[in-house]
A protein has these predicted regions:
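Catalytic phosphate/metal-binding cores of nucleic-acid and nucleotide-processing enzymes, i.e., regions
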Residues: 1-89
Length: 89
């Protein structure tokens, strides 16, 4: 299953750079290992056009390791990064 979700710039950048390979999310979508995340960068007002697509490789829910109720940690592996070219004026 593919889940389209928002991602803020402060999390998009380290994910795109390969420094962040996890997501902490509200577990309201029945995430499963093998799912695809389509993460669209959201700057608080608009989508920027930048996207990251990744596989869910690992899943931990709130019953483990002190994770808050209703949340989960998703291990991720990047498939693709989409950064639109800037338009020339």
């Amino acid at each position: 299953m593919t889940h389209t979700i928002k991602i803020l710039p402060e999390y998009f950048n380290p994910t795109a750079a390969g420094k962040k390979a996890f997501e902490i999310r509200r577990n309201d979508r029945n995430y499963q290992v093998g799912d695809t995340l389509q993460m669209k960068e959201w700057n608080g007002e608009n989508y920027t056009g930048r996207e990251i697509q990744c596989y869910v490789t690992y899943f931990i829910n709130e019953s483990k390791f002190g994770i808050a109720e209703g949340f989960c940690v998703l291990g991720t592996r990047t498939i693709d990064i989409i950064i639109p070219k800037k338009k020339r004026k």
